[in-house]
């Protein structure tokens, strides 16, 4: 999206924003604060415990469960957004991790429904981060019309919140660019405990790929 430019300086600002808000059909239970990994204490959690209302079960879809540190689930929302949570992620980047999750889900033969024998623990998440992509600065490239362009600055900010009721995401990205010419525009208990490093994806239910991904390791940055 082209917001504006200067004819004299031939400078352009490209800006895009992604904004999502989602709510769970029913609030999950607020759980006791606990540890996250071996380093962090007093972390706030929500989820499902032994005496939770069974109507919460329908909000959780099991993709697979192999062990307490190897599982993936979906938290479904009223708006059709899906919160995909995974422990034991495999892959060197988010695209590979997501594809591996989907492949493991296809071959999983266990119960994909959340039952009274299952438990869920998810940390509250709240963070605001800004990243400057300095590696892109001063890089030249040719535009479609053949004009030479240079990226002066590339910035992304992300705000994410999630608790027992739902969450919201706001992601903004801006690129400042110069151009040489003016441009025209029943089973055993399963513990789905996310109490150590885990990966999170946000996806629209009818889409094939997520629109957001994060790896949660240092929980102090997210609460």
Which sequence ranges carry the predicted segments?
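Hydrophobic-core positions in well-structured secondary-structure elements of globular domains
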Residues: 1-223
